[in-house]
Amino acid sequence: MKNLFLFCRAGYEKECAAEIQQRAAELNVGGFVKANNNDAYVVYQCFEEDGGDTLVKQLPLDSLIFARQMFAASELLADLPESDRVSPIVAALSDVSKAGELRVETPDTNEAKELSAFCRKFTVPLRQHLKKSGSLLAQENPKRPIIHVCFIGPGRAYAGYSFSNNSSPYFMGIPRLKMAADAPSRSSLKLDEAFAQFVPKEEQEERVRSGMNAVDLGACPGGWTYQLVRRGMMVSAVDNGPMNEKLMETGQVKHFREDGFRFEPQRKNIYWLVCDMVEKPARVAELIEAWAINGWFKEAIFNLKLPMKSRYKEVMAILNTMQEILKENGINEFQLQCKHLYHDRDEVTVHLWIRPSQAWN
C-alpha cells in the first residue's frame, strides 16, 4: 500500500506531518504529506507503491510523538455508493490476508464523530464480507494484523491495515479511562494514561508497585499524587499550594510547602519522580536533568508545555539536549520516550528511565 494514515489530536496536524516526514526520510521512504488543520489526521503518500507497507512495519508507533495510531492505507475511497459501500472497501483490502480484527473508525473531531453510529452499524456487514473474501479470519486473533477502515466524511474512507505488535490497542488510538470520583483534578488522567503508555502491562507489577517512594513536583491539588497513592506508593508532594485533604488523610503523602525547583529530597531511595508544572519546557527539562545527574530517581514522568509555534522543533531540541547532557554526565544507559497523550492538551508527556538494565536498590 502506498499511504500511511496517522491519527492525531485536532490542531496538531502540522506537528504530526513534520514528524512523519523526518522519520520516513530516516528510513529512506520518500513521499509527501496531505494534511488540513483540525482534521485530526495526516496522510503520508509515498513515492513507492509499497511505501506504506514499509513504514507500518519498520517505524515503531511508540517512537512517534504526535501520532496516536497509524495504518498502511490504500488511496482514498471517495464517493462510495450508498447502495454498496462494502464492495469497493473489500476490493481495496484484497491484498490483506487473514487479519484478526476489524476497526471501522473516524478521526477524533466533532464532525467525524457524527458518523460513529453509521460506523457501528456498517461494521457488521463489512465484517461478514471480509470474512468471505479471506481478508478477515472467522474469529478474532490478537496476533494477526488489524484491518482499519477510517471514514473521514460521508462516503469517504481510507482502508488498510496495521500490525498488532506495532499498533495502539485502542479504537482510534484513544484509551478509555474513567475519571475517579475522588480524584482531585482531571489532570490525574494524564498520569494514569502515561503509566499505561510507557510501562508495559506485564512490567507494571515490578515497576509501578506498592511500597515505592515517589516525589511529585508541583503537586497541588494532587491529581498526579492521587495516581501514585492509588498504586500504594509513599509520596513526597512538593508545592506551595494546598493539597487535597482526602489524599493527606491516607497517610501516604507528606506535603512539602516548597518551590519544586529548589526542593531536595531528604531520602535518596526514590523510584518515581513525576512533574506537571506550568513552566517553560526547557526549565522543566533542566530540572529533570539535575535530578538524574544527582541519582535521585530511577524513572520519571514529566510534562513539557508546548509553545504556540514550532512545537515539534522545540520538543525535539529539548529531547536531544537532554540526551547529550545525560551522556556528558556519565549516564550512558537510559530510555527516553515522549508522547502527545490523549489527555494532554498543549503539552507532551515524557518518560525517562535511568539504567534500565540495573536493578533498583
UniProtKB/Swiss-Prot annotation:
Q: Which residues form the active site?
A: K305
Give the CC-aspect GO terms: cytoplasm
Q: Name one GO biological process term.
A: methylation
Query: What Enzyme Commission number(s) does the record list for this chain?
Result: 2.1.1.186
- Compartments (UniProt record): Cytoplasm
Reaction equation(s) it catalyzes? cytidine(2498) in 23S rRNA + S-adenosyl-L-methionine = 2'-O-methylcytidine(2498) in 23S rRNA + S-adenosyl-L-homocysteine + H(+)
Which residues form each disulfide bond in the chain?
none
Gene Ontology MF term list = S-adenosylmethionine-dependent methyltransferase activity
Q: Which InterPro entries match?
A: RlmM_FDX, RlmM_THUMP-like, RNA_MeTrfase_FtsJ_dom, rRNA_MeTrfase_M, SAM-dependent_MTases_sf
Q: Which UniProt keywords apply?
A: Cytoplasm, Methyltransferase, rRNA processing, S-adenosyl-L-methionine, Transferase
User: Would the keyword Lipid biosynthesis be found if you checked this record's keyword annotation?
Assistant: no
Protein's UniProt keywords contain Transferase? yes
**Binding, S-adenosyl-L-methionine:** S187, C220, P221, G222, G223, D239, D259, D276
Q: Which Gene3D superfamilies match?
A: 3.30.2300.20, 3.30.70.2810, Vaccinia Virus protein VP39 (3.40.50.150)
The UniProt family comment states: Belongs to the class I-like SAM-binding methyltransferase superfamily. RNA methyltransferase RlmE family. RlmM subfamily.
Q: Which PANTHER family match?
A: RIBOSOMAL RNA LARGE SUBUNIT METHYLTRANSFERASE M, RIBOSOMAL RNA METHYLTRANSFERASE FTSJ DOMAIN-CONTAINING PROTEIN
Q: What does this protein do?
A: Catalyzes the 2'-O-methylation at nucleotide C2498 in 23S rRNA.
Subunit structure, interactors included:
Monomer.
Q: What is this protein called?
A: Ribosomal RNA large subunit methyltransferase M
Species of provenance: Shewanella sp. (strain MR-4)
What broad taxonomic lineage does this protein's source fall under?
Answer: Bacteria, Pseudomonadati, Pseudomonadota, Gammaproteobacteria, Alteromonadales
Gene that this polypeptide is encoded by? rlmM
